[in-house]
């Protein structure tokens, strides 16, 4: 059991038989009445986001999530396939279950698959991934004086803002938590 006063972004809780991840939370103490915690929760199985208000100090069961290293194999358009590196069992997940992680998945990439009661409910990506730029506008000499940025499409289909000196074919390090460009590699 965990108290609502101990909520943190990324925490997983069990509510009404489902697993939810805390996306946002806010402790509210009105001038009149008891304090409460307003939160946004993402259902780990379906990807649906709900808003829920709890009394401050309310005890909620914490979801016991198992992490297993798996390799991303391929996508058939709707479902994403992963293989357990120890047992060679294959697991499929929908895009809704993966959320924003689909923008950073590369074939043969090792990731942590999250399991609840033996069923896959999501993935945990490495903090940084290296991806190749497949499309961006060419940089023009003298562009860098303003220190601006331009959009670039990566090999996974994700679009990120990059500095003007980045060209097609460059490999970039991307932060998977924020989706921001870090550096050229």
From Swiss-Prot:
The keyword Protein transport does not apply. One of its GO terms (cellular component) is cytoplasm. Keywords: Cytoplasm, Elongation factor, Protein biosynthesis. Belongs to the elongation factor P family. Involved in peptide bond synthesis. Stimulates efficient translation and peptide-bond synthesis on native or reconstituted 70S ribosomes in vitro. Probably functions indirectly by altering the affinity of the ribosome for aminoacyl-tRNA, thus increasing their reactivity as acceptors for peptidyl transferase. This is Elongation factor P. It comes from the Bacteria. GO terms for molecular function: translation elongation factor activity. NCBIfam families: efp, PRK00529.1. The keyword Cytoplasm applies. Pathway: Protein biosynthesis; polypeptide chain elongation. It is found in: Cytoplasm.
């Amino acid at each position: 059991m965990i108290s609502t006063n101990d909520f943190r972004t990324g925490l997983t809780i069990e509510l009404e038989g489902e697993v939810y991840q805390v996306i946002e939370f806010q402790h509210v103490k009105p001038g009149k009445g008891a304090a409460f915690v307003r939160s946004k929760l993402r259902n780990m199985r379906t990807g649906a986001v709900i808003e829920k208000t709890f009394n401050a100090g309310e005890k909620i069961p914490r979801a016991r999530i198992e992490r297993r290293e798996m390799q991303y194999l391929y996508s058939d358009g709707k479902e994403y396939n992963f293989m357990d590196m120890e047992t060679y069992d294959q697991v499929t997940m929908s895009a809704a279950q993966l959320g924003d992680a689909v923008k950073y998945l590369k074939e043969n990439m090792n990731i942590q698959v999250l399991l609840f009661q033996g069923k896959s409910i999501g993935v945990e990506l490495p903090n940084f991934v290296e991806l190749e730029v497949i499309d961006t506008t060419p940089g023009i000499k003298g562009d860098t004086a303003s220190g601006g940025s331009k959009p670039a499409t990566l090999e996974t289909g994700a679009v990120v803002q990059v500095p003007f000196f980045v060209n097609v074919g460059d490999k970039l390090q991307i932060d998977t938590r924020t989706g921001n460009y870090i550096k050229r590699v």
